[in-house]
Amino acid sequence: MQCIVKICGITSEEDLKAAKELGAGFVGFVLEEKSKRYINLRRLKSLSMITREPLKSVALLVDPSDDFLERLLMSSKVDYIQLHGEESPERVEEIAKITNVPLIKAIGVEKESDLLRIRKYEGSVDYILLDSKVKENVYLKGGRGISF
């Protein structure tokens, strides 16, 4: 099994430099407006343009609309899209067809039985990301340093 480190919440050139120096494989850009690490599509474009190998750029989205996906694709080139919402397996397959970009699906884990959800996404995503399931604030899905 391969473990890849993704540092998410990149908002600046300094963040990118630090992620590379620390050996991250992926860097994540949060496009969810409710997040304190949110960046807009214009900022994503500038940061993704300077993201260099071996780093892979990841656009983190929460339940994206088709319109938003189209705007994302027109404004930036990202290596991966991470789906961090309540996207069904069917919706994930639609997103794969619309974007033709490799997908990462985040699965919230609170208890062992939550891991069973992984099977639903087999074959429709390139990676599964296990994250803590956060109860107290449904709008901030993960990435808060909470272990499970």
Language model features: what each stretch is:
Residues 1-148:
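Conserved N-terminal beta1-alpha1 strand-loop-helix module at the mouth
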